[in-house]
């Protein structure tokens, strides 16, 4: 889509040096130059001056602007380029997502171009542990907060966001592309995204969710061995699949869980894990946010050494806490360092078979099991149609 947009901008008389490409990374690690070329394509990258292709930096004092609060009371601190550009074009996709039902729409700027304080307003226990966050849905306080933050940005912009979102299939092929204002694009893209994402199973609600967690996926290398990210993946799976299960299902996850945190990309995670061990439950981590999220060393790693922002660890812990709130037990099967799994509140077994045996004892009957071996790769949201 980017080459087509660059073509239209050129036809309209916009010079390349007046185009700025900002990777809306939010609190994720910054992309290296070769990664940006892989994402955007060498041809598109060559058409924009190198200095105009940047990562969002949530801690850059020259590029972050405080707009006050949204209509829902959330802090709105945003990348200055959004406010000062004549036109801001948001390019993304509408894909199934445990955070607010779908990616894209107002989720793009509200999470990708803001500060940790803005993101902490919704990636938090107060929102995520509400009764409308699970299962994944666009009808939630979380989604309302994203909309309010995006709308607040637009009050300070010369014109509203021009959004271009694609609906993708399970192999990342385009099923549809929608362009216009964000409300228009959300309204137009969500029906197709729902048809692609919602998978209705002709079964009774299941008792056990069985998932496999690879070492490397989604957030980066070590996601399946880093205990915080491992449990985040489990919480996300519960959000995606909750409608296919009994009220308090059991989760069995096969994971290497060897305690490799990948410190180079996730520098604050070991300290966050140690903090979690002093808490009774994940929500108690709220009391530690300010100290870790403002730590100069971790902020430096985010800004200059391609590390995740320190608050990112908290948002992952809170999603992992969904598993505690919405299941009767979580088993990690095959952990090489089981103490890390237990530190996240999970039970441990040597094998999946052993975990299934224990689940049978808990339930008092042979469990009905749904297996999702590739975890979130298909990005389906499951529903059991029989009562």
What are these regions, as identified by a protein language model?
Residues 184, 188-200, 233-242, 306-324, ...:
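A short, acidic, amphipathic alpha-helical segment used as a generic capping/interface helix at domain edges
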Residues 224, 228-331:
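C-terminal catalytic subdomain
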Residues 2-21, 38-65, 182, 247-250:
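Alpha/propeptide regions of enzymes that mature by internal proteolysis
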Residues 134-220:
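Membrane-embedded hairpin module used as a gating/binding unit in multi-pass transport
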Residues 30-102:
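An acidic, phosphate/nucleotide-engaging active-site surface
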Residues 318-387:
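Extended hydrophobic packing segments that form well-structured cores
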Residues 90-96, 103-151, 155-162:
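Mobile "lid/hinge" segments at catalytic clefts and subdomain interfaces of large enzymes
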Residues 89-91, 207-212, 252, 370-371:
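Structural motif
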